[in-house]
Structures are given as C-alpha cells and as structure tokens.
C-alpha cells in the first residue's frame, strides 16, 4: 500500500476537523493520511509503544506538512489507560489484529471517544492469521463484534488488495453508549 491507498481507505468516512488519535500509529502511514483528510487545524495524538517509529512519524509529518504543530506523540501501549482528551475519532490501522480478546480492547478504546465519536478500523479481511498477523478479523466478524463493545453496526468504507493476506478493508463505527 502507498499513501494514496491509505488516504482512500479513510476518505469515505468524510471526517471533519477535530481531535483524533491513531492507536498503534507506528511510523505514521495512517497518521499522515488522517492529517491530509482532517487538516492542520485538527489535533492528532499518535500512540505507539515504539519510540523510534514515532520519531520517524514526526520526521515524515514535518516533511509532508512542514509542521508538527497539533501532532502529539505518545510512546505508550494503548491497551493500558491513557491520558487523552475526549476524541472525535480514532484510527486503528492494523492494530486490532494483535489482540485475541478484541471485544475487550474495543470496549477500552470506546471510552476514549466522545458520544457519537468515530472508530475507523483498517484490517486484513481474513479470520486466520500468521505469526505477523496473529488474530485478524474479516469485516463480517467485525460487523458482529463492534455492537457488543458499544458501537453502532460498522459500515464498510473501502477495500484494497494486500500482497500478504488477500485484502485490507476499512470500516467506520460510532460510539453509541
């Protein structure tokens, strides 16, 4: 996938300016796509355990947008409590598949969102994984799971081919509880 694919997976969500987090941001592929869509007046909290990946993200953000203002880097495990403001939206791109108990992690991230806040999920569209993608979930599985964690029924946004595990999908669900 390239930057255009990342943007195109998020674009159908029609996000507006606000306060967002990219949980499991890594080196920032989807953080950069999110920034392109929500603009420089939005605040983005990029959360990842890997400090060096966050440093790469910061450099890439500065190179692309000539600023790191309103980009807040947090070196932390998002499955633990975080000090974040109420969020308008969360991006979880290829981070949910690291958790076996997905309902538990979804309930956890649910608490970071404002009422009606958006959860954008990007995942491999398969239910069986490998050592690098241990617990993926198809859109159909996610569609069933998300409402049990306090979200609306997810809406499929887009799909792009994957060289490794068939395809990626993006979906949006909203905090309802």
Features from the language model and the residues they span:
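Conserved alpha-helix/loop element of class I SAM-dependent methyltransferases that forms part
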Residues: 1-19, 33
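Class I SAM-dependent methyltransferase SAM/SAH-binding core
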Residues: 21, 27-80
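A short acidic, Gly/Pro-enriched loop at the edge of an enzyme's catalytic core
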Residues: 79-90
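A short SAM/SAH-binding and catalytic strip from SAM-dependent methyltransferases
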Residues: 88-102
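A short glycine-rich, Lys/Arg-flanked "PGG" loop and its adjoining helix->strand segment in the class I
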Residues: 103-115
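Conserved beta-strand signature within the Rossmann-like core of class I S-adenosyl-L-methionine
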Residues: 116-124
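Short alpha-helix
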Residues: 135-150
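Core SAM-dependent methyltransferase catalytic element
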Residues: 160-177
